[in-house]
């Protein structure tokens, strides 16, 4: 080949190598997994917005028991509302019984289904310990049905005479209409004692028992110790004397769960045995004297 052509060829190669070249990157095709993940993300965002909308509706007070009309929670929610309403009206002094329709009207539950009404009439209200049935109507049933402050004072006096102690204030507030006025009107005829759990107990203040005791008798009383006796023995002694301990007014103690102790595993002791597998083969040569 002509040498001039070879020189031109080499020069062309050098110029081509020195010229910069920009390449376009290939756009990667989206895999089906990535597209499905994007769709899931969009669904989650949509669901989150709907959930936040429900939360805002609940906060605005638009949520009610009707949303749970097909569940058991709706039934028991209606029952709880009825019992609370009957208790409130009893505390106001409205102690006359009402029909089921009147109760549903006053609690704004006239739109409940026939199954719920039947359940309230035949099971829920009849078997509720706080509701009593009077001639086909329903009334609140407190632990102590008190009409006025005189009835309260007689009840406390009766408890004191029988050695039953006091009565919880919350039980009195439940059964006595306008209880705060009645308790305030009794004044020093009753006594208040607060329990460790901050619940108050009312006692009858027997003024006939207010007398001075000689100091010598007080010292003798304080000198008697019961440290050597447990509570069961003290309670048995009080019962023999006709005195009952006031257990109902005290705070209930939760019984502690006793854990079963795992029996200690007794490992069998192993003794070393030497050449036990050769017991029938070995011989004793201790009696043979070695030859000279």
UniProtKB/Swiss-Prot annotation:
Keyword Ligase part of the UniProt annotation: no
Superkingdom: Eukaryota
Positions bearing N6-acetyllysine: 75
Keywords: Acetylation, DNA-binding, Nucleus, Phosphoprotein, Transcription, Transcription regulation
Biased composition (Polar residues): 51-63
Main localization of the protein described in the UniProt heading: nucleus
Protein name stated in the entry: General transcription factor IIE subunit 2
Classification lineage: Eukaryota, Metazoa, Chordata, Craniata, Vertebrata
